[in-house]
Amino acid sequence: MTLQEIFAGCTAKPLLAEEPMAKHTSFRIGGPADLMAMPQSEQELQQLLQRACEAKVPVTLIGNGSNLLVRDKGIRGLVIKLGNMLNDVAVDGCTLTFGSGVSLAAASRKAAELGLSGMEFAVGIPGSIGGAVYMNAGAYDGEMAKVVTSVRVMELDGTISELPAVALDFGYRHTALQGSGKIVTAVTVRLTAGDKQAIADKMADFSNRRITKQPLELPSAGSMFKRPPGYFAGTLIDQTGLKGYTVGGAQVSEKHAGFVVNIGGATAADVLQLICDVQDKVFAAHGVHLEPEVLVLGEE
């Protein structure tokens, strides 16, 4: 039985066979997914997961693909893209609950519209709020750990539960969700009442800084490396003379050395080789090991 036949009875449509993952990542890189589904509700997600569990089909979950590198041979089994799902928002005073598919930037703007402070840092971060919790995304001294109070999660067998923030074990670009098999379907944050103009001004400042300093004009997966203790990854890479360093179609950004950009036709192999080269050269020059921040999926 083919994958399309296994999932034919599911209400999530369309089911995309041999779907190029390059179309679904901000890097514009990645081989094909055997089958991709984009559920629009918890019920559709539950149905897909239960069918996959019964048929023993491997499942890979992605959000909006903004912090992701997919290898050139693609991903086997079923890929479920959650970025279009669960875009609802519920407001209860200073507490907001977002469906996991809400973009982080949209969540930040919604909070600002309500005069609530705490999510200004998120205005320019790409991706969904569900993915942002998974990776504990952050910028400008803000991070998801500072505002999240609980998450709603679904297990790979379709069961649903609520987890308090303390159960997520937040760390730098880390949560207990990583590798757990739990799928975030909703995120609850608690913010503080603030001055709308002051919030808007702070968001405008953060947006302008990103436009000025980051290579937003080229495909990338955001910051490539985690910040090593006591250092900035981009500064170390720049000091090693690697701005503009190129492997195939992948390049250390000439605008910000903490970013690897796709200058045209880059493959995952190009990016992975560039990462290794940068790690080796920075370690040789500074004795500091750079750890990638970007999630790597798929077959080599």
Predicted features and spans:
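Short, well-ordered alpha-helical segments in soluble proteins
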Residues: 111, 129, 133-137, 152-155, ...
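Structural signature of FAD isoalloxazine-binding scaffolds in flavoprotein oxidoreductases
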Residues: 30-31, 37-42, 69-87, 134-165, ...
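Phosphate/pyrophosphate- and phosphate-bearing ligand-binding catalytic cores of soluble enzymes
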Residues: 16-17, 68, 154-281, 285-300
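Anion-binding (especially nucleotide phosphate/pyrophosphate-binding) glycine-rich loop
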Residues: 2-129
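A generic local secondary-structure boundary/capping motif
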Residues: 67-68, 108-111, 119-123, 136-143, ...
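Generic structural motif
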Residues: 15, 87-91, 148-151, 250-252
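Short, basic and Ser/Thr-rich N-terminal targeting/leader segments
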Residues: 55, 62-64, 147, 218-219, ...
